[in-house]
């Protein structure tokens, strides 16, 4: 009983940290795929998930992770991600420099 009272909340917190790491990793991966697209297109094209998903640029979102590109130009790129299983419902944002917040 006592062990379960300690272990179960810790396990839940551990799972949430893993979900949050997955959401951040998806932002990093979409940023790298967009960088490759912009290198191919001289930085002028919008980066969309349709363009970077698949063999050419390799982006594939993880299961249960929603990633949205909110600003598709290289100069002011922004994207968000959230893992649907994360109990804290934390939405992460990446800017044009690759910085992730929160």
Language-model regions, residue ranges each:
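Amphipathic alpha-helical segments typified by the pilin-like N-terminal helix
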Residues: 1-25
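Periplasmic/extracellular, small/polar-rich flexible segments of pilin-like filament-forming proteins
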Residues: 32-102
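Alpha-helical assembly-interface signal, strongest on the long, hydrophobic N-terminal helix that forms
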Residues: 16-40
């Amino acid at each position: 009983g006592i062990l379960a009272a300690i272990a179960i909340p810790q396990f839940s917190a551990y799972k949430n940290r893993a979900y949050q790491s997955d959401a951040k990793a998806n932002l990093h991966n979409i940023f790298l795929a967009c960088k490759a697209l912009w290198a191919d297109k001289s930085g002028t094209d919008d980066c969309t998930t349709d363009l970077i998903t698949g063999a050419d640029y390799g982006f594939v979102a993880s299961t249960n992770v929603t990633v949205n590109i909110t600003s598709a130009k290289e100069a002011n790129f922004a994207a968000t991600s959230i893992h649907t299983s994360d109990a804290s419902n934390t939405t992460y944002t990446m800017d044009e420099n690759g910085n992730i917040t929160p």
